[in-house]
């Protein structure tokens, strides 16, 4: 009985993947794609315009933004590319 219980605990941990991290893109504007592993469960992409043109920032989480900045948050790996 103890063996069965231990087996169920191990299977549960493997299935839940308790150490899971999200993979988000983190390159800026038109730079080559780069990624990072994040503890957060979402990725973001912020877009705005300034004197240099359209700017894009990508990263982990879902931050609050100022008016005039477009924010897209998503919940799958590399969804903010």
Curated annotation (Swiss-Prot):
GO cellular component: a single term: extracellular region
A single GO molecular function term of this UniProt record: toxin activity
Matching SUPFAM superfamilies: Snake toxin-like
Major location (coarse): secreted
Expressing tissues: Expressed by the venom gland.
Keyword Transit peptide applies: no
Keyword terms, alphabetized: Acetylcholine receptor inhibiting toxin, Disulfide bond, Ion channel impairing toxin, Neurotoxin, Postsynaptic neurotoxin, Secreted, Signal, Toxin
Disulfide bonding pattern of the chain: 24-43, 38-60, 62-73, 74-79
Compartments reported by the entry: Secreted
Alphabetical list of Pfam families matching this protein: Toxin_cobra-type (PF21947)
Entry annotated with the keyword Signal: yes
Gene3D superfamilies per UniProt: CD59
Any coiled-coil regions, as ranges: none
Superkingdom in the source lineage: Eukaryota
Family: Belongs to the three-finger toxin family. Short-chain subfamily. Type I alpha-neurotoxin sub-subfamily.
Role of this protein: Binds to muscle nicotinic acetylcholine receptor (nAChR) and inhibit acetylcholine from binding to the receptor, thereby impairing neuromuscular transmission.
Protein name as annotated: Short neurotoxin 1
Organism: Hydrophis hardwickii (Hardwick's spine-bellied seasnake)
Lineage of the organism: Eukaryota, Metazoa, Chordata, Craniata, Vertebrata
């Amino acid at each position: 009985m103890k063996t069965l219980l231990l087996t169920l605990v191990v299977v549960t941990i493997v299935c839940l993947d308790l150490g899971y991290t999200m993979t988000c893109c983190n390159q800026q504007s038109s730079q080559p794609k780069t990624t990072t592993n994040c503890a957060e469960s979402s990725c973001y992409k912020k877009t705005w315009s300034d004197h240099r043109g359209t700017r894009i920032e990508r990263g982990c989480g879902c931050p609050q933004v100022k008016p005039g900045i477009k924010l897209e948050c998503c919940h799958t790996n590399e969804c903010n590319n």
